[in-house]
Amino acid sequence: MDSSKEPEPTGEFKCQLCGLTAPYTYYGQKPPNTHSIVILEDSYVMKDPFTPDKEKFLILGSLCSLCRRAVCVGAECSLFYTKRFCLPCVNENLQAFPLEIQEDMDKRKPQSKCLTRKKKDSRT
């Protein structure tokens, strides 16, 4: 068999907030073919389709550390502050976050489209 073959997808990642779907090839903190990279959280990862370099990858998302729902890394759906948090959990627990995060969330509110998209799609 040819060892240079592309990795087969392990499954399909789906953000439970915005509905983004993409095939992932690895879940964890140390993606294959990377020598010195360790991700700070267990993440859904895919090989970067825009480069032939096997060491390049894209982080699709991970699980919210509070509610455990799968969320993408998009700013409309989650944030990383020592751990990954979905924006609904951040908003519910906003006072527990540092002032900088609280101020950042205040700036994001008028731009947040994630929850309005969710309401439009009654299938999920």
UniProtKB/Swiss-Prot annotation:
InterPro entries: CDPF1, CDPF1_dom
Region span, Disordered: 105-124
Family under the similarity heading: Belongs to the CDPF1 family.
Compositionally biased residues, Basic residues: 115-124
Protein name per its UniProtKB record: Cysteine-rich DPF motif domain-containing protein 1
One Pfam family matching this protein: C6_DPF
PANTHER family: CYSTEINE-RICH DPF MOTIF DOMAIN-CONTAINING PROTEIN 1, CYSTEINE-RICH PDF MOTIF DOMAIN-CONTAINING PROTEIN 1
